[in-house]
Amino acid sequence: MKKYIVFLILTGLFGFGLMGQNEKVGKELMKVIKTRASVRQFADKPIEVEKVSHMLLDAAMAAPTAMNKQPWEFIVITDSEIMEKMGKEFKNASALSTAKLAIIVCGNMKEAIEGESREFWVQDCSAATENLLLMAHSMGLGAVWCGIYPSKERTELLQKFLNLPENIVPLNIIPIGVPADNVAPKEKF
């Protein structure tokens, strides 16, 4: 009986310790979620492109997907001339002109679910995009989701611009860099 009581006490203390840790992590995560904002102007400050893009892509690919299909492709662009041309071509992505990095999140239709559930690729790639945006913010970087799909005109234009095969469908362009200013999140509640 004494061993059982000691076990319950230890279990309770251990559980309380975990609850405290989980609560702390939860509060930190909620802070990142609530303070993230769309950043459209970037400072002329360098970033460690390889390290940053690796971390952002790791976060993106940790997203859940329907049937674990992972129907995504990520195109990383670091060439400022290409980003500037894209920013002029895609007015909703003018933030590319000052970004140090851009990631284009695409759906790979060869990896997507077949049949009536095919469009789940949009949700899968959207979840990956949100993970990427939150990770960028947690690293002190700014980013903005510039929509491409479902606009047929934008989708076809970007496919042509990047010479993408027909099965790769761009969902969005995400310009990334050090924010030029402190951007406050919009009131949403």
Give the positions of each predicted feature.
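Sec/Tat signal peptide C-region and signal peptidase I cleavage site
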Residues: F16-G20
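A glycine-rich helix N-cap at a beta->alpha junction
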Residues: S94-A99, Q159-K186
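N-terminal amphipathic, basic helical "cap/leader" segment at the start of enzyme domains
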Residues: Q21-L101, G107
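A short coil-to-beta-strand element that immediately follows conserved catalytic motifs
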Residues: Q70, L141-W145, V169
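Acidic, glycine-rich active-site loops and adjacent beta-strand->loop/helix elements
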Residues: G107-K110, I148-K152, A180
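Sec-dependent N-terminal signal peptides
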Residues: Y4-F14
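Small-aliphatic-rich amphipathic alpha-helix that forms the alpha element of a beta-alpha
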Residues: M55-M61, I103, E116-L158
